[in-house]
Amino acid sequence: MIFPNLEAIEKLSIDEKIAQFGNKRKVKYSRGQYRSNMMLNPLRLKHLNRLDNLEADTVTLNLEDAIAPSRKREALVNIAFFLSHMEASNSFLVVRTNPLNEGGRQEIAFLNDFAFDAIRVSKIKTQKEVQEALGLLAKDKELHISMETKEAFNNLQSLRIDERFTTANIGILDLLNSLGLPQSLVQMGNPTIDYILSKFLIDCHSVGLQGTSFMFQEYQNTQAFEAWCKREKMMGFKSKACMGPLQVEIANRIFGVDEAQIERAKHIKEAFETHSREGEHGFMDERYGFIDEPIYKDALLVLKGLE
C-alpha cells in the first residue's frame, strides 16, 4: 500500500490534495508482460492505494466514461496525488483520458509531470488527433488509444505515425455502436465479432502495435470470461482488458507462456544456432522433428515474451 491509513486523506478537499502533492517518482515498468489490463476507478481511494502492489500487468486509471462530469477534476487530482507519493509499482500504469476536445488536452497537460507509463486517449478518429496527442504528451511516456470508432477501425494502420504510439485497446461496445451494429452480436463464435477481432489484431501487428482485446463486463461470469480468453489466445491475442482481480488471475494464467513452451523454444533456439554455425538451416531434431528458420523465429518470439 502507498499509505498505511487513508482516514486523513479521505477528509482532504481537492485543493488540499494539490497542496500536499509529493515528489516521489516510480521507476519505469520493465517486466515486459502485458497479459492483463485492469481498469480502476480513481474515485475509489482504496483502489488507488494498492497501485504499488497489484497482480495486473497493466492498470488503467479511467477518467472517461465511468466518471461523471462533476467529479472528473476530483478523479484527476486523486490520480496525481497517489502517483506523487508512490515509489514503485508492479504494474504498467496507464491513465485513460477523455477525448482531446472534451478535456483530454487539459488532463494530459496536468499529468505530464507525474510518474506513470502511458496515456490512453479515448474516441480517437484521425491521424491528426494522434499527432496532437503525441505533441501534448511528455517524451518519456507512451501513447495508447481506445479503438472504439469506425474511423479508427477503418484506418488503424495509418494512425501509427510515431514509435511512442505503442498500443491500441479495442472497445467493442462503443465500436459496434459507431458501426451501427447491436451489442447483442458479442457472443462466442459470432462471425462478425470474429472478423472485427481478427482485423483489429492483424492491423495492429502489421504496424507494430500491441492490441488488447475487449473488456468482458459480466465480471462474475468467470467461466465465460475464461472461454473468451482461450478463444482470443487461439486467435493470437496476448492481452485482455479486465474488471477486477478474478479476471486478472484468469488472464494472467491463460495469456502466460507455460513451461513446456519455454523449454521447447529454448531447445529449438540452441539447436538451430548450433546447426546454423555449420551452415545447416534445416534439419531433423530428435525431440521436435523438423526445424528450419521459420520455426526458429517462432521460438525467438516465444522467448521475447519473457523479457
Label each PLM-derived region with a short phrase.
Residues 1-307:
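Expand to "…catalyze enediolate/carbanion chemistry for C-C bond making/breaking, isomerization
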